[in-house]
Amino acid sequence: MEWETIIGLEVHVQLATNTKIFSGSSTAFGAEPNTQACAIDLAMPGTLPTPNAEAFRFATMFGLAVNAEIGKRSVFERKNYFYPDLPKGYQTTQLAEPIVGPGYVDIQLADGSEKRVRIHHAHLEEDAGKSLHEDFHGMSGIDLNRAGTPLIEVVTEPDMRSAEEAVAFARKLHSIVTSLGICDGEMSQGSMRFDVNISVRLKGDEKLGTRTETKNLNSFRFMERCIEQEVERQIEVIEDGGKIIQETRLYDGETHKARSMRSKEEANDYRYFPCPDLLPVMLDDDFIDAARAAMPELPDARQLRFEESYGLSPYDAGIISADAATADFFEAVAAKCSDAKLAANWVMGEISARLNAEEIRITAAKVSAEQLAGLIARIKDQTISNKIAKQVFDAMWNGEGDADTIIEAKGLKQVSDSGALEKMVDDVMNANPAQVENYRKADPAKQPKMLGFFVGQVMKASKGQANPQQLNDILKKKLEN
């Protein structure tokens, strides 16, 4: 039997407003528990919410970025359920008339193909608080600092057919909201959380299978593993004669396993009704036009510009343009060193490797764009080789100064003096007469590989500082005489 996977996503995007969606409380991350929740956030008697205009502006920008219809009239409703970190006993959200209507996002896959993922809608809502379980033996604590933080929840159509497609969409969405500046994208801090709806059906069937929802995934790696495991589990259950239960599941990032939390609720279970404390919000054309005018360059447009202006390949341009901060860093390096391709190679290579190893963002890189451009300039003018450049980069990352300072202090300048190189080549050839004879008698097709021995010996003698191109030219000339 051949199975088909059906995936839809619900993505919670925390908006980067300074205050909450219905109150003036701060949204800053990392404050002491319960120091940023006011009477409005807790729905104390006598309080009334006031909508945050910035949240509406951010949601409008998002809608425009994903080719969606903007709801000029949007209505808030109460979603009623009990949970300890939901102090009101309901969540203020949108259902019937959301601010963002149908739209779409185009994603690129590893094989070079493109796919369109439809967005059903996106709505504004308030976040809940946070339950804390680790610091309280036998009990749980509640931190309400997050309660009332503005979110947009993005709901897709079930258009994705694999973990690869779901992760590609999630990455693209992350790229869009961070480029817009409406979300900081810090997934480890809960700024973006993904709920994954998964079902399977036999290839060719039209009817959707019973779905499960796995909640609050906060990394692309977790999402990929979770989807692959859940698809495998569902297929195994069905092939063994069982039935999939519609349920909500929770993925544990430490054990990399998902477990059942509860049966999956339907909208009716939440008893939605219009919020009596909030009037419908009406957006006029001027508001929408102002939001459009404030939008920065989006990832797709940036990728195309990088291909056309800098001559980057679609792959390189796509990688660099996906993150706004990385794109800015690259452009700063390229402008200072006048070699976009070398700049791209170093940003995607050494810089990216260090950022991943230290789990930091490029805004915290220990080598500035100006310093990296200085290093590339020394490669271009042949002061140092690519191999030596990596040593210099290591020293720069460790705070030992700029490229020129390190090259001078460590004596790393490339040996480009032809007389000095010829002497080193002569010394190596005199010390290895048998290898010289073998080279001269060898089939020409084998000589390039044999040349590597002599290159290695001279590089060893020069402590890696011989100019590779000049060295190759001198060796070939002398060995062929």
From Swiss-Prot:
The reaction(s) this protein catalyses: L-glutamyl-tRNA(Gln) + L-glutamine + ATP + H2O = L-glutaminyl-tRNA(Gln) + L-glutamate + ADP + phosphate + H(+); L-aspartyl-tRNA(Asn) + L-glutamine + ATP + H2O = L-asparaginyl-tRNA(Asn) + L-glutamate + ADP + phosphate + 2 H(+)
EC main group: ligase
Keyword Ligase: yes
GO molecular function: asparaginyl-tRNA synthase (glutamine-hydrolyzing) activity; ATP binding; glutaminyl-tRNA synthase (glutamine-hydrolyzing) activity
Keyword Disulfide bond found: no
Top-rank lineage group of the source organism: Bacteria
Any single GO BP term: glutaminyl-tRNAGln biosynthesis via transamidation
Subunit: Heterotrimer of A, B and C subunits.
Family membership: Belongs to the GatB/GatE family. GatB subfamily.
PANTHER family hit by this protein: GLUTAMYL-TRNA GLN AMIDOTRANSFERASE SUBUNIT B MITOCHONDRIAL AND PROKARYOTIC PET112-RELATED (PTHR11659), GLUTAMYL-TRNA(GLN) AMIDOTRANSFERASE SUBUNIT B, MITOCHONDRIAL (PTHR11659:SF0)
Function comment: Allows the formation of correctly charged Asn-tRNA(Asn) or Gln-tRNA(Gln) through the transamidation of misacylated Asp-tRNA(Asn) or Glu-tRNA(Gln) in organisms which lack either or both of asparaginyl-tRNA or glutaminyl-tRNA synthetases. The reaction takes place in the presence of glutamine and ATP through an activated phospho-Asp-tRNA(Asn) or phospho-Glu-tRNA(Gln).
Protein name: Aspartyl/glutamyl-tRNA(Asn/Gln) amidotransferase subunit B
Source organism: Teredinibacter turnerae (strain ATCC 39867 / T7901)
